[in-house]
Amino acid sequence: MTDTTTPTAKATDWAALSAELEQTLRLRSIPFAMKMFERREDMEAIPRIRRPSAVHTLDQVVGQASRLGWTVGVTAEDLVGAQCRAVVGLGGAKTDDWRSGRHMKGVWFEDDAGAAAHQAAMHCVPDGQFEALAVSPLASGRLGEPDIALFYATPGAMMYFINGLQWSGYKRFDWSVVGESACADSWGRALTTRTPSLSIPCFAERRYGGVLDDEMLMATPPEHLFRALAGMKALARNGFRYPFPQYGVQQDVRAGMAVSYGKD
């Protein structure tokens, strides 16, 4: 049986890893993977890859993987406008016009300065490195070793995942909220910094990508999934499991606290 608790296993059992993540966090949608490709031909060679027949936002493409279980590959021409392309570095989208934020002035930001500052604040993959991108359910393993793994979850589940990450080798997480174009906070940041990246999905993700109102998005290099799951197993042994049972707002708290922290 393949070891899914450490990244040192000879071959990752992506199906087992995905199933464990889904079960531990009670996920309502499919954990999925994202991978960048220097050549579109390599993306097109993925088994059972789907290619869009219409123009989409990347939020929609991501939704096809996380809600429908599809494996989808895109190039710059499949994505609407420069904003979607810029975050993942496709199509040389980061022109002076894009940096100005002109298309967002009066829509999301009051003036030129605010629109330009927003563009500058985004985490984006540099242009010129990649021709294509693919997303696929993590369990399928079709992307081989993906660049990042992603999943949607409730705030409570996200907090438990973070607790798992912080169980061993604690560090504080400081995440960004760029506002609209929040994909820059999730997959844009994870692809560029190679660190776990949590986001509050924006209007476009919810309107076009099918993201539910109570969902947040985690994007992370896959090795951090192993660390978080190991941490959550340790927390479970201490009695902390998701979903967290309600104790009651009028109860004497001492009995509950004593279970975790002992009696004074």
Protein language model regions, located:
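Acidic, serine/proline-rich low-complexity intrinsically disordered regions
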Residues: 10-264
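Domain-level signal for soluble alpha/beta catalytic cores
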Residues: 3-6
